[in-house]
Amino acid sequence: MSPQELKARIASGLLSFPVTHFNADFSLNLPSYQKHVAWLSGYDAAALFAAGGTGELFSLTPQEIGEVTRAAKEAAGSVPIISGCGYGTELAKDIARRAEQAGADGLLLLPHYLMEVPQEGIYQHVKAVCDSTGLGVIVYNRSNSVANADTVARLADACPNLVGFKDGTGQTGLVRRITAKLGNRLSYIGGMPTHELFAQGFNGLGLSTYSSAVFNFVPELALRFYKALKAGDEATMAQILDSFFFPFADIRDREKGYAVSIIKAGVELIGHTPGPVRAPLTNLTPQEKDMLKALIANAGS
């Protein structure tokens, strides 16, 4: 898939990122992962992110990222697979190479590791990764790597394979500056935790689409909300927010890191075998899983 084909594809519909499946000893469980990816691919997702943030990129080795990406690509049929990528520049370039060899259709470049850096540093880092690969790249603004509109424009000028921008900051003013300055040069993705909670507010900022974590275990509900957003169906969105997303967020917010853990728990509760999260994340308690189970049952009623 060419970078421009990827740009068009990610703007065409809802996106999601399968959780990475582990065995009880925390080793990769690729057969279980592929079963889940194949199931998700039967729904109407524009693309899936392998080894993204919800896929616990931060707990995977570069070799494992390549293995997960290859497994996803084998299982996904015609659905494009975008590999997570991140950390320091040289490590990110290595991950990008492995992802390309594994058959990825694109890269999602998560923040560099830990350090606070100036805009020039962000520019040099993203450019180096883009220059190292022929894949289309989506840059992810969040945490300690927040490019401003001028930096994103410089990168778009310098990197013909930079095709997407994903926001995880929630800074509406910054997002609008970027979408206004870059226009149709990029596709724009909403990437806040449980983005459905923010989707209506971000809808007028020029975003093309967003990524849905709950698509992992309630894909029909996730798609119903997405279609209501695109249709301007405020009543349907309000009903889904009130009956599912608000109580879901209440469970998610009980502990730090549950934005990932609760998704893996949801996948388990519908009959898949994703296994535990890797440390330093922690799993939901039995009581919290019961709360989520009841919420899922209600969502299907």
Swiss-Prot record:
Sample GO molecular function, one term: 5-dehydro-4-deoxyglucarate dehydratase activity
Pathway(s) it belongs to: Carbohydrate acid metabolism; D-glucarate degradation; 2,5-dioxopentanoate from D-glucarate: step 2/2
Gene3D superfamilies named among the record's database cross-references: Aldolase class I
Catalysed reactions, as listed in the record: 5-dehydro-4-deoxy-D-glucarate + H(+) = 2,5-dioxopentanoate + CO2 + H2O
Enzyme class: lyase
Family label: Belongs to the DapA family.
Name of the molecule in the record: Probable 5-dehydro-4-deoxyglucarate dehydratase
Gene source species: Bordetella petrii (strain ATCC BAA-461 / DSM 12804 / CCUG 43448)
Classification of source organism: Bacteria, Pseudomonadati, Pseudomonadota, Betaproteobacteria, Burkholderiales
